[in-house]
């Protein structure tokens, strides 16, 4: 049958695929719209598989809360440009809503779940890959809960390059919980307090500081006292409640939280791409790779 411009337009609107791809799909399927959609999906998924060796180290973090449940997730893309794409923004919101509603235990379980639209999460992401043209990866997520007497603090820095979700216990002051989240985004503490630091890590630091003091030629009788003082600074660097509060450096974070009649139950901080070794291709290689890929 003859393939009309209107048919091509309709298929483009339904799939977001390019004009020539849509025309080819309709020709191959004799104008059957549903089969043409399947054809493009299959083609898109094949493209996605080809991109599997790329490193998706850009992207965004996103936070969603609903009542006493909160979620933070990281969705990776290959370029910062795509992370600003409307399709990417829509996808991350859809994934957040699904994850918060279904509460899968991990990414693997999440990928196999069925979304409200009847598609598997993995399939839904692959369709977005076909439209957007980059590898997209649901890297990680965490679901946290609170009671009616607590508050979530949600903060996205630089539009989602860093995301922090806190739970303030014993206070419903969301502004205070967000202030703590902003501090965590800026300072990046490893632990809530000293109790969370392992004995092994403390002992290792103590040995390093002791050797440091001895190498400085300090008398052995004062080394132990010096080391304890320096350990205090070490704890300030890694423990949230021991740190000077960013919004008011005259008080510790612990004092700020206590001034709200609260305790900090926990926090999750995600920075996009942390721990991922991003491959750096030079421009000439990138052009050559594209030329080879189009053959």
From Swiss-Prot:
Gene Ontology CC terms, in alphabetical order: cytoplasm
PANTHER family in alphabetical order: ELONGATION FACTOR TS, ELONGATION FACTOR TS, MITOCHONDRIAL
Function as written in the Swiss-Prot or TrEMBL entry: Associates with the EF-Tu.GDP complex and induces the exchange of GDP to GTP. It remains bound to the aminoacyl-tRNA.EF-Tu.GTP complex up to the GTP hydrolysis stage on the ribosome.
Species in which this protein is naturally found: Bacillus cereus (strain AH187)
GO molecular function terms listed in the Swiss-Prot or TrEMBL record: translation elongation factor activity
Keyword presence, Protein biosynthesis: yes
Similarity comment: Belongs to the EF-Ts family.
Record localization: Cytoplasm
A Pfam family assignment: EF_TS
Residue numbers spanned by region Involved in Mg(2+) ion dislocation from EF-Tu: 79-82
This protein's UniProt keywords: Cytoplasm, Elongation factor, Protein biosynthesis
Annotated protein name in UniProt: Elongation factor Ts
Transmembrane portions of the chain: none
């Amino acid at each position: 049958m003859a393939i009309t411009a209107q048919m091509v337009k309709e298929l483009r609107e339904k799939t977001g695929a390019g004009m020539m791809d849509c025309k080819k799909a309709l020709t191959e399927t004799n104008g059957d719209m549903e089969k043409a959609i399947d054809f493009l999906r299959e083609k898109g998924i094949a493209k996605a598989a080809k991109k599997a060796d790329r490193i998706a180290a850009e992207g965004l973090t996103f936070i969603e809360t609903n009542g006493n449940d909160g979620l933070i997730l990281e969705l990776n893309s290959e370029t910062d440009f795509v992370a600003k794409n409307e399709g990417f923004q829509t996808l991350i919101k859809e994934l957040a809503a699904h994850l918060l509603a279904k509460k899968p235990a991990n990414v693997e379980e999440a990928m196999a779940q069925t979304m409200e639209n009847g598609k598997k999460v993995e399939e839904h992401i692959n369709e977005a890959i076909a439209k957007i043209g980059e590898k997209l990866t649901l890297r990680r997520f965490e679901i946290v809960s609170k009671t009616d007497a607590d508050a979530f603090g949600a903060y996205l820095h630089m539009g989602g390059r860093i995301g922090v979700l806190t739970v303030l216990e014993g206070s419903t002051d969301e502004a205070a919980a967000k202030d703590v989240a902003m501090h965590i985004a800026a300072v990046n503490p490893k632990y809530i307090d000293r109790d969370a630091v392992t004995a092994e890590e403390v002992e290792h630091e103590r040995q390093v500081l002791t050797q440091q003091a001895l190498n400085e030629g300090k008398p052995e009788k004062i080394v132990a006292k010096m080391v304890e003082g320096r350990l205090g600074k070490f704890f300030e660097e890694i423990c949230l409640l021991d740190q000077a509060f960013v919004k008011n450096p005259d008080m510790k974070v612990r004092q700020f939280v206590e001034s709200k009649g609260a305790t900090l139950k926990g926090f999750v901080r995600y920075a996009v791409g942390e721990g991922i070794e991003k491959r750096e291709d030079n421009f000439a290689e990138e052009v050559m790779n594209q030329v080879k890929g189009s053959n």
